[in-house]
Amino acid sequence: MKRTYQPHNTPRKRTHGFRTRMKTKNGRKVISARRAKGRKRLSV
């Protein structure tokens, strides 16, 4: 049986990357929430 997670960097960046997050209002919310929490990595 094939597993569901088949990692690839391109789709990963496209969906969860910093630039992608900054494109939308909600994405910017995500980044700011992670900044406020003090996350070491804000995005992928």
UniProtKB/Swiss-Prot annotation:
GO biological process: translation
Pfam families: Ribosomal_L34
A Gene Ontology molecular function term of the record: structural constituent of ribosome
Record-linked PROSITE patterns: RIBOSOMAL_L34 (PS00784)
Gene Ontology annotations for the cellular component aspect, listed alphabetically: ribonucleoprotein complex; ribosome
Keywords: Ribonucleoprotein, Ribosomal protein
Gene3D superfamilies linked to this entry: 1.10.287.3980
Annotated region (Disordered), positions in chain: 1-44
Protein family: Belongs to the bacterial ribosomal protein bL34 family.
PANTHER family: LARGE RIBOSOMAL SUBUNIT PROTEIN BL34M (PTHR14503:SF4), MITOCHONDRIAL RIBOSOMAL PROTEIN 34 FAMILY MEMBER (PTHR14503)
Protein name per the record: Large ribosomal subunit protein bL34
Organism the protein comes from: Sulfurovum sp. (strain NBC37-1)
Biological classification of the source: Bacteria, Pseudomonadati, Campylobacterota, Epsilonproteobacteria, Campylobacterales
